[in-house]
Amino acid sequence: MVCPDAETVYVSDIEEGPCRVLAARFPDAVNLGDITQIDWKTVEPVDVILGGSPCQDLSMAGRRAGMKPGTRSGLWESMAQAIKTMRPDLVVWENVRGALSAEAFSLMESGTRHLGGGPDGPVLRALGRVLGDLAGIGYDAQWTTLRACDVGAPHPRARVFLVAYPAGHEGWLLQREFGDATHTGSQGRGHAGHTVTREAACGWASALDSGRAGASLTLLPTPTTQDGKNNGGPSQFERNTPPLNTVVKIPSFGVYTPAIKRWEHITGRAAPAPTILSDQGNPQLSHYFTEWMMGLPDGWITNPALWEGYTDKATRNVCLRMAGNGVVPLQAATAINHLTHLDAA
């Protein structure tokens, strides 16, 4: 979407579900496996490093353990080592809004909370840790927070996006505007397509300035990793809202209809049925619907060919989990495009 000619050379994941999707969608990319075990000196350098260290320890929906050794979010250290060694032209880091407030550990300080060695010093937050590490290895950075509904999605998922580039550069300004998105054919293979139009993408990008996209619409709850469970869970930062798998069992979308229609228009794709029947014949949240809510191409994570050997229940659960951990592609593209063009404004 941002740089359609870019080639994905490496990925790094160890979970079976995401690994299956990555292998199918990026068949020529090498999965380097456990990021903590990679010797980056043996890996051929690349132009762009993009990642989002696991968010569960930063998310308001998680246990808020923070970014420190022994936590999943602490995997940022491995990403930072990759950046330090490979020296890419552009770094993109994405995470939950909790990165703005979750505590962090830094090798620059003796403690895990206050800076400056005293109890009254400022608290180091996860985003501050990332910025400090990047500065320490010679990278400047710009960042923003963007909600999925700011680009027209029917839910409010907020994400922090950061771009960084070698210090002293004026910025890694992209020469391309939004390209065509990628969608899948009948066999679920990715190829060039038109899931999101250039006009729609650029139109919703302008909402960054107004901050009004979605302001007048009632939004669906954000997909979460808990949606596969019977009772689901609340969306991040929306503890008083019902879980998505409860809302979709309502006979009519009612107040949510305008938000759904808007996303259908932007993606050029009709919303799938929001529920499917369980083995017991009861309606339950459809993983095809959450895939659509996240703005993913049809079949990107739900194509049955990906899940050979999985039961229907297991397939649904792994897809809901991936959607709950994911980010809307148009949301990410809008944020990256905005940040990489700040110096040109």
Which residue stretches match the model-derived regions?
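Class I S-adenosyl-L-methionine
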Residues: I38-V48, Q56-G228, S252-A271
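C-terminal target-recognition/interaction regions appended to catalytic cores
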Residues: Q187-H191, T195-A345
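Generic enzyme active-site microenvironment
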Residues: V11, L32, L50, V92-W93
